Amino acid sequence: MKENDHLNSVSSSEIEKCDEDVEEELYSYPDSDFLVTFNGEDDPEKPLNWPVSIKLLNTALYGLTTFAAQFNSTTMSPTTSHLVNAYPIGHEVAVLPTCLYILGIAFGPMIFAPFSEVNGRKIGVLVPFFLSILFTIGTASSDSVAAIMCTRFFAGLFAGAPVVSSGGVMADLWCPAQRGTALIFYAFFVVSGADFGPIISSLVTEHSDTAWRWPLWTIVIIECFILTLDVFLIKETFGPVILATKAKNLRLTTKNWGLHAAHDEYRLDFKEFVTLHLVRPFAMLATPIVFFIAMFASYVYGILYLVLTTIPYTFGMTKNWQGTISTLPMIAMFTGVVIGGSFNIMWNQRYAKLITANGGKPLPEQRLPLMMAVGWLMPAGIFVFAWTNSPNIHWIAPFIGISMMGAGFFVIFQGCLNYLVDTFTKFAASAIAANTFTRSIFAGTFPLFSEIMFKKLGVHWGGSLVGFIALGMIPIPFIFYMMGDKLRRKNRFIKLIT
């Protein structure tokens, strides 16, 4: 009996020792042996090394998705009179569907930036885009003013995902020397969507005073077509998620359950969400650099939407243009944007050489000379538009003014964005979120008073008021060109939030 007890004791000890040996052996391997990474900088699975054709396809598809989201932002601007005819509301209420959509976009970065970082660009953009389509269908099917307003806000909120997160795709796909040009072409999609929305909308509503739903169904069809292309043709571009998917496939094929990617260990908790994505963007607005640059970019963005939503009204006042013809000046705006984009592309080539000479380190202040040289076109164009928009002056004159506005707008807007990214490289997402929030607030509120302003002051002085404020902001890039580096080094608050 004692011998059996002794044998049992020995067996138990040996088993425990064996378990300890196995455990020690199992955990003695370094974590790097189980960590899935890219196979060097030249790994073909890395998005930066994809064929140019694949990069261009993904850039174009994300650009089209953003085009549709921006198209939706202005698609209801020509339908204000139709809403007044359909419901017992005034003009101020009828313009709210456009404003609420843009205000919804203002809050998108706070939600969808972390969502795309956890789930990847494709899911992080396409799922909210699909939900935006559903809410747009809800607007088109609404029978009450309250339902229209509510669904428009949420359509804009979810549309904030492609508007904001798609920019990160450019960073995934293109190296720094190419990224500036890629971002310019991407920005063309952003602005052209807002430009062409009213034109198409006025076409489909021209022959009916109550057909305010038709533009919404039109954009739903366009968005569904683009979403279908996205689902089948877009590839995931976010490196950490690509590696997590690769690790999952390797675990299934090798049965080695220890294989994992660094992204598998990432968990976004509530505290991190609040600190990084809610508090930091607003905290950054308290710094002089972010505040004044964001205000400059936001004001010109607000002017863009002010012009886009009131151009038909102003040309109706001065030249009695009605329907689709009253929206054609928006083509002049897009022409100006293309010209401004050409300036940006040429300057980016010089900037790339400066970065190379500086050892690859960003030079934020070198983003500003183009704004200093061309930014004056924005206020100058506003004055030309305002004072040549008269019955006795040929229409080409205000069109030239609108094109000047478009060129100046694009140079300022893109320059401000690039300056913030170069200044806060590590926390560029927060800087962009702060900029997106403020610009959407401006764009969402300017249309509320624009028509009333032109009605009370007239086209000449109403436009001049906007132009004088824009003129007062022209010194901003000059100030930061001379003092930007000094402000960054002396501002303790920047160090605190970064």
From Swiss-Prot:
Protein name: Uncharacterized MFS-type transporter C947.06c
Record bears the keyword Membrane: yes
Family: Belongs to the major facilitator superfamily.
Coiled-coil ranges from the UniProt annotation: none
Parts of the chain that traverse the membrane: 93-113, 123-143, 153-173, 180-200, 214-234, 288-308, 327-347, 368-388, 393-413, 427-449, 461-481
Membrane topology: Multi-pass membrane protein
Species name: Schizosaccharomyces pombe (strain 972 / ATCC 24843)
Coarse class of the protein's main subcellular location: membrane
